[in-house]
From Swiss-Prot:
The keyword Chloroplast does not apply. Belongs to the COG8 family. SUPFAM superfamilies: Cullin repeat-like. Component of the conserved oligomeric Golgi complex which is composed of eight different subunits and is required for normal Golgi morphology and localization. The gene is Cog8. This is Conserved oligomeric Golgi complex subunit 8. InterPro entries: COG8 (IPR007255), COG8_Metazoal_Plant (IPR016632), Cullin_repeat-like_dom_sf (IPR016159). It holds the Pfam family Dor1. One of its GO terms (biological process) is protein transport. Required for normal Golgi function. One of its GO terms (cellular component) is Golgi transport complex. Keywords: Golgi apparatus, Membrane, Protein transport, Transport. The lineage of its organism: Eukaryota, Metazoa, Ecdysozoa, Arthropoda, Hexapoda.
């Protein structure tokens, strides 16, 4: 059934009848209009006829009531109107304020967000401050790490200092983004470097092996140097200490300086070698295997070679000091030689026997000292010969030269030299030089000593000849005879005696054993034998005719330590 639609259609028809010009706007959609139309639909015809009159009457009544109400409530209406106007004004002002508020709401939102952020930060800071207050003791320990480490280093507690440095390193790895932690780590690193310098500086002092082991152990734990670098640092530091000890020795007295240098170098250098080998032990088998498998790759810093080079350098420095002090002059070369040989022998225990390197130095020094002594003897002989005179020279000693039994041969100088003071002074000078040489006479100098004396005797003969040429015009018979005796004493007393003294210092038997030749070969090669012919060549026309008797081979074999003088019978 379509009743609702049909009713709507009827209502529209009724409305057209009531409002031919259309329904007023104020009644459109009014539910009372619909209710009134529904009520009209229920009225009878008589009621419909009276409805218009009723409505007019009702309208008139309502109008009267409204007028009465307006008259009775006039003031109320005025007040209401004023209030309405006031309310309207307030609403307008409120609308303006709301518009202003709406325009400022974004800024307010931003400020609120900022306030919330600041509040959150303040809250976080307050929370951190609370945690800081609770963890105050632990934070103080962290903040005092640099001071604590500095105190440990100052007091020598390096074990604790290393633990603090390791803790600071771990702290920096985990909390490195915190500025305070970064500052603490930097301070600890600076103190770590100071400790490294202090440990290396301690190696430059007098240390025993346990202390050296401890210090190098700390350096290894610090991992500041590689193995070869650590070896180099150790040798440099110990070398600086050894050098300071040597530089502290007074240099005024060469003998004392050299003795102290030998003692200090021997003791301290041996200690350094012992310390090095204890700290850096070498596995020879491993080293040989590595060296055999490793190809050549340019220059490398091998620890063992580094130590050998350093030891070679120290020995070279000692040899330079030895040579310099010996050249300055020492009182007792044999004492220094004994100390040096003991020094070199003691180092054979560590495979560094360097006695062979000292031998040429001593040989050279002894040779120069002997040559210097002989030169002084030559100068003295020249001065004495210039003051010498043959006037009233009487032979006080016999000039007969006896055949001496080799078994009872003596090294006493010939008494005939006493008649001629220059020859006696020359002989005494030779004896002084040979006696000084005898205390420390290297076999390597046998030829040099013989050559030096040969040259000196040749110069003596030349000076005697010059003396003859200068004075011969004024010679009387007795003076000429005295000069012949002087020449004979030089040729047949002094020269054979010096030859015997040479063999006393350098026994032929010792030379034959050293050279691996026989006595006959030694004589044939003229080793340690003076060449009398060359010595006496300038004076041969002034010497009396003598028959020379050479020693027999059996005599030389019976007494190799005796000289083989060139003697003359009669």
């Amino acid at each position: 059934m379509d009743f609702p639609d049909k009713m709507d259609l009827e209502n529209e028809r009724v409305l057209k009848l009531i409002f031919p010009d259309g329904v007023p706007d104020n009644l459109r959609g009014n539910p009372e209009l619909d209710n009134y139309l529904a009520k009209l639909g229920t009225c009878k015809v008589e009621q419909l006829k009276k409805e218009q009159t009723r409505l007019a009457e009702e309208a008139r009544t309502i109008l009267e009531q409204t007028q009465d109400l307006a008259i009775s409530n006039y003031r109320t209406f005025i007040t209401t109107a004023e209030n309405s106007r006031s309310i309207f004004s307030e609403f307008l002002r409120s609308e303006q304020q709301l518009d202003t508020l709406v325009s400022k709401l974004p800024d307010l939102s931003v400020q609120c967000e900022r306030f919330l952020q600041d509040s959150a930060e303040l809250n976080e800071q307050r929370r951190l401050n609370s945690i800081t207050l609770q963890k105050n003791a632990q934070l103080l320990e962290v903040l005092e790490l640099p001071q604590l480490m500095e105190r440990c280093i100052r007091e020598g507690r390096y074990e604790e200092a290393l633990e603090l440095a390791a803790y600071a390193t771990r702290l920096g790895q985990h909390q490195g983004h915190i500025p305070v932690v970064t500052s603490i780590v930097r301070s600890v690193e600076a103190l770590w470097h100071n400790m490294l310098v202090q440990l290396v500086a301690q190696l430059r002092t007098d240390l025993q092996l346990p202390k050296c082991l401890q210090i190098v152990g700390y350096l290894r734990r610090m991992q500041a140097f590689g193995d070869n670098e650590l070896r180099l640092k150790f040798l440099q530091a110990r070398d600086a200490w050894l050098t300071s000890c040597l530089e502290a020795i007074p240099t005024a007295d060469a003998q004392q300086h050299l003795s102290k240098t030998i003692e200090i170098t021997r003791i301290n250098l041996f200690n350094i070698i012992t310390q090095y080998r204890a700290i850096f032990p070498e596995d020879e088998g491993t080293l040989k295997t590595q060296s055999s498998l490793r190809p050549l790759q340019g220059v490398s810093c091998n620890g063992d070679r580094l130590f050998q080079a350093w030891l070679h350098n120290k020995i070279s420095d000692f040899l330079q000091t030895l040579e310099r002090d010996l050249q300055l002059g020492v009182g007792s070369v044999e004492t220094v030689l004994g100390q040096c040989m003991y020094f070199g022998l003691s180092f054979s225990r560590v495979g560094a026997d360097f006695r062979a390197l000292m031998a040429p130095i001593f040989v050279g020094v002894i040779r120069r000292r002997f040559e210097s002594s002989v030169e002084q003897v030559d100068e003295q002989f020249e001065r004495e010969l210039e003051r010498f005179t043959l006037i009233n020279k009487v032979a006080l000693h016999s000039h007969a030269r006896k055949q001496v039994d080799p078994e009872q041969e003596s090294y006493a100088p010939p008494e005939a030299l006493l008649d001629f003071y220059p020859l006696a002074a020359l002989c005494n000078g030779y004896l002084s030089a040979l006696n000084e040489l005898r205390l420390c006479a290297p076999l390597a100098l046998a030829t040099d000593v013989t050559r030096c004396l040969q040259h000196s005797l040749q110069q003596a003969a030349q000076r005697v000849l010059a003396f003859y040429r200068q004075e011969q015009q004024a010679f009387a018979g007795s003076e000429r005879e005295a000069f012949v005796r002087l020449c004979s004493c030089l040729a047949y007393d002094l020269v054979p005696y010096i030859q015997r003294c040479i063999h006393g210092v350098f026994p032929p038997q010792s030379l034959t054993v050293h050279l691996g030749i026989s006595l006959l070969q030694l004589e044939q090669q003229q080793l340690t034998y003076l060449q009398q012919t060359r010595i006496l060549e300038p004076l041969k026309h002034l010497l009396p005719t003598k028959a020379l008797v050479q020693p027999q081979d059996k005599v030389m074999e019976a007494k190799p330590s005796a000289g083989v003088p060139v003697t003359a019978e009669g």
